[in-house]
Amino acid sequence: MYTFEVFDSRTRSIVKLEDCLLRLYVCGITPYKSTHLGHAFTYVGFDTLFRLALDSGRDVLYIQNISDIDEPLFQYAEKVGIHYKDLARTQTKRFFEDMHTLECLPPGYVIPVSKVLDGIKTGIEGLISRNMAYKLPNGDVYFDSTLTDPGKMFCFDRKTAMSLMLETDTGKNPFDPLLWRGRGAEPQWEASFGAGRPAWHISCAVLSNLQTQYENVLHIYGGGRDLAFPHHEFTNVLSKLIRAPKDNKQQDTVQDVFMHTGLVSYMGDKMSKSKGNLVFISQLREQCEKIGLHHSVIRLALLQRHYREDWEWQDECLDRAASRFRLWKSALQEYIGAKGIRSTADQNKGTQGAWERIHGGVFDSNFDHRQPIHPKHSPQMRDYSEHGSAGQNGTDLDLSLYQAIRFHLCNDLDTPKALDAVDSYARKGTITIPEARAVEKLLGIPLTRV
């Protein structure tokens, strides 16, 4: 096992990941519209972390949620005249297809909010009983934010924190986040404190708080930088309070780290549904297919930016990635030709088969939030070991490219420098098959499958 370093957005410092269970919770989608580049940049970034952590020999508990109980989903379903459950299933399938396009590995657990409703109710009941949450006459339940210092976790002053609050409904205090929408809520579920449905922060708090039997746990909260406050702060506060002893003392052995990806702009503004300046992954895939490019070029275009960087998408981003991909592929073909090898193409479907396998069970399978969960990885990760798949039965040159990629990724996922390292080897004339497999395992670019 080897150590690596990441940047903690809360402490604004580098954290070294030692020997521990790595629990990675990345906020998933609200399944009502397709995946755009802003989403993709986040998921590719944390997929790279997932790959590196597995390669290092760690146990990794990677969880993503699906917000199938969420106001934007209900509103959009009503607007287009479709049942929200049908919309959630259809859009989740499309999201999985987009994740395959991006060559992302499926997390160990992809869990809809609807599967942990009982846990959410129990969590809210506990907060109410400890006078940490309160119910209004209209049925809404809010968390009492006076128990914390909103914005402090990420060094926002009160004025800035207030400007970032997304709550359209307020309780006794403008910083109090909604936990349970009681008034006029349809659909709704019964609870001891009144019928309604859960809100965003408490849902993620419960999902990120699923029990494990490990003692030494480092918990990474992942998402876009715009989630830091209020979402990640309140998710973390609620999570700690839910798992704290009933005497209200927050005795906790879990170390929390926050990693946030940069924001992607297009046409001068941050990509957002409200502004309509979105570039969808499905559109880029069609664009690649029309000109004979493999879809992994989209992932390569995203890896050209450091995960913490704010940047703007332009057509040149894809062109540059395509040139890079051709350079790498040509260098591999040079090696294949020199060795007289007929084909290196793997006969598997890569990440596609893995995403297809989990799709059917996401909404239909039973999930007991009370039972401890354990690390589990997709089938294509079976050959991960401390040395990865690169360098095994290869030459010193094979191993040194693997080491070069790993060196840069261990430095806070420095993908731009990792790509430069592959460029350097490709320009020397050849990329060997073991080197190409190192590129796939660590960077997710499948040179041997295209």
From Swiss-Prot:
Query: In the UniProt record, does the keyword Ligase occur?
Result: yes
* Keyword Electron transport in record: no
InterPro entries hit by this protein: Cys-tRNA/MSH_ligase (IPR024909), Rossmann-like_a/b/a_fold (IPR014729), tRNA-synt_1_cat_dom (IPR032678)
The region called Disordered is annotated at 372-392
Q: Which UniProt keywords apply?
A: Aminoacyl-tRNA synthetase, ATP-binding, Cytoplasm, Ligase, Nucleotide-binding, Protein biosynthesis
Q: Where is this motif: 'KMSKS' region?
A: 270-274
Where is ATP bound in this sequence?
A: 273
What are the protein's GO molecular function terms?
ATP binding; cysteine-tRNA ligase activity
Recorded catalytic reaction(s): these are: tRNA(Cys) + L-cysteine + ATP = L-cysteinyl-tRNA(Cys) + AMP + diphosphate
E.C. designation(s): 6.1.1.16
Q: Name one GO biological process term.
A: cysteinyl-tRNA aminoacylation
Q: Which GO terms describe its cellular component?
A: cytosol
Places the protein is found = Cytoplasm
Q: Where is this motif: 'HIGH' region?
A: 29-39
Query: For this UniProt entry, what is the primary localization, expressed as one broad class?
Result: cytoplasm
- Give the PANTHER family listed for this entry: CYSTEINE--TRNA LIGASE, CYTOPLASMIC, CYSTEINYL-TRNA SYNTHETASE
Protein family according to the UniProt entry: Belongs to the class-I aminoacyl-tRNA synthetase family.
Assembly: Monomer.
The protein here is known as: Putative cysteine--tRNA ligase 2
Source taxonomy lineage? Answer: Bacteria, Bacillati, Actinomycetota, Actinomycetes, Micrococcales
